[in-house]
Structure formats: structure tokens, C-alpha cells
Amino acid sequence: MLNKKKKILIAGLGNANVTADSLGPKVVNNLYITRHLQKEGIASYQFELSAIAPGVMAQTGIETSEILESLAERIKPDVVIVIDALAARSYSRLNKTIQISDTGIAPGSGVGNHRNEITQHTIGVPVLAIGVPTVISVPAIIHDVFGEKSLENVSENIDEEFISMHVTPKNIDESMKRISYTISEGINHLLHN
């Protein structure tokens, strides 16, 4: 998908102030951005890379999909790459799996905070999504440990607030540094070497 694409916009989704949700902004902070260098004639690169960490709707009052649609109309990228933290369905994938999709993403859907989807249909250009599961729900943990039958039995006896809770490992700070660096360096190497 990237071999013929020259103008790339990367969007680091998530809340930079919440460690488990800060993957996107952390990746953006480590990228080697080149759009401004090419526009000013300072340097020439195979790819024109621009990036944004748009925050979350609670910070901006604007759907991230609206921000990206407006940016795509203005700077006309050939492809948008979105990077976001995800919710795991299994503890074995927590902070260990990097998922890549060419169908876009629905931010917040893993934790029940459904936002407008970010897809080629909504943005107007192809969308690649890169995500890492950084949180897991209590029901997913119960299912991992005890199986489906126990999940049904336990769910009946647990407070609704507890069932809707998402948790993250205690080493999330270190994991986030490592994962965000791995993704950003992978992108930097792919686009600039």
C-alpha cells in the first residue's frame, strides 16, 4: 500500500495524559517528520511525512475523524496511518501484539467509548491502522482464567461498575516507551531508509 504513496499523514490517537492510552501521541513524538523540510526546499525525501496527535474528544470537543477529514482535504495525503491503543480480549496479547489493518479503526470501541470511525469512506483516502492492546476488561480476564461458563456465573454476582472496568499491567510506563519506540522506529526506517 505504501510503495506508490508519497504523501503520508500519521495520526497518533489517544490521550497523552493517560499512560495506557498514550501510544499514538508517543509514536508521533518519535517520528522523523519531513513535510515541512520538503516544502521549504531544505531536503528531499522519498516520502513527505506529516503527523498529528489530535487528542481525544474530551480535550477538543471535536471528533477525531472530523479533524483528520479536514486535514486530509487540506494537505491531500495519499494515505493516512492511524496509531492507537486497543483493548485486549486475551491477557496473552496485552502489550505484546502489534495489529495492522487496512480497513481503518473505530476509536474507543474497545472500551465502550464509541467514536466515529476513521476509514477510507470517512476520510476520503486509504487508512492503515496500527494498534497495540494496552488494557483488558475484567470479563476478559475472568474468561481467560476460568473459561466461558465461569464468566457467566461470575458476571451475575459482580457489580456492573466492576464489570465495565478496564485494567493495565503495572509496568505500563516501561511497556509504552518500548512499544512506541518500536513502532516509530519501524515507520522511520520504512519511510526514510
Residue ranges and their predicted role:
Residues I8, D78-V79, V127:
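Conserved acidic residues
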Residues S22, K26, E63-I67, I75, ...:
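Conserved active-site and cofactor/substrate-binding residues in soluble primary-metabolism enzymes
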Residues Y45-L71, K76:
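A structural-propensity feature for long, helix-poor, extended segments
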